[in-house]
From Swiss-Prot:
Residues 87-303 are annotated as: UPRTase. Uracil binds at I285, G290, D291, A292. This is Uracil phosphoribosyltransferase. Transmembrane segments: none annotated. Coiled coil: none annotated. Its cofactor is Mg(2+). Residues 1-86 are annotated as: Unknown. GO terms for biological process: UMP salvage; uracil salvage. Its EC number is 2.4.2.9. The gene is upp. Keywords: Allosteric enzyme, Glycosyltransferase, GTP-binding, Magnesium, Nucleotide-binding, Transferase. GO terms for molecular function: GTP binding; magnesium ion binding; uracil phosphoribosyltransferase activity.
Length: 303
């Protein structure tokens, strides 16, 4: 019992520390539209309980991001190669960008090519905890009666929503411990995706999912959202097994990957720690952090 109490208190301290350090930071909710060629200023979306919202501007398939606390280059303007009339007409899912100073600091440590695997793993775990914290803030609660050491009290308690975290192998494994630190009772699935380095097309080589996944809130974790091909294929595979409530958690993403997920799966919400500029000719994120799987496992030069 003492061990459990210590674990809970340690987790709460981490959350309180993160909340205190987020003063003055900002979060952005992104929505795409692909209609007018003129810039259109959107009214702030309903306030998400983290901090102040920013304004979003969209131009056809291009988007520009303005933030009060961060440089405007957080998300660069881009033009999609996808024809406007072929994009989904359904409402596009929200994308939440975390701009917490501690997360941004640790993301910079991940980017540094001189960061060793041990520190890389620790930072990835800590960032994942922060992203999980934001992604789970809408979980349903109900009041239950409990006996404290002093009195009987009605206290909020999770309603019993089943949660599954699914890492995309192998880099996604580095995000699991951070997620489980906050949601220790979550089930863990596994999906392995490999990418053809010439065509950049994904293929699945492993799929181990809970039998009751249709009744679960599924959180897919993968550090990198580059072309979006692997993430889209993973989401599709999970849906084929019956999952309906899916959230995607990433550390780094680029506009191309976000657009791909919003086009293929407009019902999936994305939480990302940091937005990068673009992809290079090899479909690697720039400035990025290199190959997250290699750096996590120490299997190659991080450059």
């Amino acid at each position: 019992m003492h061990i459990i109490m210590k674990t809970i208190l340690a987790t709460l301290c981490l959350i309180l520390c993160a909340s205190c350090c987020s003063k003055g930071a900002c979060e952005t909710r992104i929505k795409h539209t692909f209609s007018e060629k003129k810039f259109q200023k959107y009214s702030p979306v309903p306030k998400h309980p983290l901090s102040e919202q920013t304004h979003l501007y969209a131009k056809s398939c291009s988007i520009e991001l303005e933030q009060t606390q961060l440089p405007t280059s957080t998300l660069t303007r881009y033009v999609s190669s996808t024809p406007t009339d072929s994009l989904s007409s359904k409402p596009l899912a929200a994308v939440y960008v975390l701009s917490h100073p501690l997360i941004q600091h640790k993301a910079s440590l991940l980017r540094n090519k001189n960061t060793k695997s041990k520190i890389f793993r620790e930072c990835l775990k800590e960032i994942s905890l922060g992203v999980c914290y934001e992604a789970t803030r809408d979980l349903a609660l109900k009041n239950i009666s409990i006996q404290t050491p002093l009195m009987q009290a009605e206290c909020p308690h999770l309603t019993g929503t089943k949660i599954v975290v699914i890492p995309v192998l192998r880099a996604g494994l580095g995000m699991v411990d951070g997620f489980l630190a906050l949601v220790p009772n979550a089930k863990v699935g596994l999906i392995g995706m490999s990418r053809n380095h010439e065509t950049f097309q994904p293929s699945s080589y492993c799929c181990k999912l809970p039998e009751d996944i249709a009744d679960c809130h599924v959180f897919i974790v993968d550090p990198m959202l580059a072309t979006g091909g692997s993430a889209s294929a993973t989401i599709q595979l999970v849906k084929e097994h019956g999952a309906k409530n899916i959230t995607l958690l990433n550390v780094l993403a680029v506009p191309e990957g976000i657009e791909r997920i919003q086009k293929d799966h407009p019902d999936v919400t994305i939480y990302v720690a940091s937005l990068d500029e673009k992809l290079n000719e090899s479909a690697y994120i720039l400035p990025g952090l290199g190959d997250a799987g290699d750096r996590l496992c120490g299997t190659s030069n991080p450059s």
